[in-house]
Amino acid sequence: MRWAIGCGLFAGALALATPVMAQDARMTVTATPAEPSAIPLNTGGVKGQAAPEAWFSQYGVAMTRNVTTATLTPFLPDPAKATGAAVIVAPGGGFLMLSMENEGWRVAKALADRGIAAFVLKYRLKPTPADMGGFERSVTAMFAGAAQPQRRMSPDEAIAGLGDQIADARAAVAMVRARATEWKIDPARVGMVGFSAGAMTTMATTLAAPDTHLAFIAPIYGSMEAVSVPADAPPLFAVLAANDPLFANKGFGLIESWQKAGKPVEFHLYQAGGHGFGLGKTGTTSTGWFEDFMHWLDANGMLVRR
């Protein structure tokens, strides 16, 4: 598997994991929100992490960092509309923070509105300084490092670096299947959608833990590098903007890998949208990806009530 997940990519994803729009880019500390529906996944903590989980606002959306306890938050559809399909939603944030609102809750609510049980995965993150000033300084330092040539990680290094995230994703899938009857879910129709770093988590789970048997995967503005496709790889739906500053203009190896392996694949390259657009950047065709995704799920038999 040829897949670059380096320090520079972490920094870039961190900078761009929130929507690029004319809003306040300052990081403002906020109170930790109540998460009464969040279910601990019991996957352990984070080695060397002493700082508590912290929440803040940037670009007008809720973010969190220093996550040491992975959780899964259900967004269940109206039983009258439920299709039986389920999706694990993995937000992005460069593995240093999570864009919970833009790439988590909003997406999950949109899925539930369409009859799909959605589950926002708050996965464990890399440690950052406890105080916001220290966090901002560490981000600045990382940006400076990202400007320098980066060593390409080996496949084993890349997967090893995402061990916590893969474990959290596997636990999330296992929990959804274990409670399928309670949540009125077809265990054979559990897929995963991930944004940026969440897309990398989705792909890493698919490649390193094929025993999760995901029914489908949707990496949204994730890496397009070629991979070694598992024999039982699930159907893939991928989205990217042509002006994505991280992943555009680097070829479409991921798509070609799925094609060459003879696996179902659909790819949407939108003219504009940048990176971190969530459900879509207003004024661009990237706002159409969610409907395209719904159509693709339906065409692949994922939304048929059984």
What kind of feature is each model-predicted range?
Residues A17-P19:
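N-terminal signal peptide c-region/cleavage motif recognized by signal peptidases
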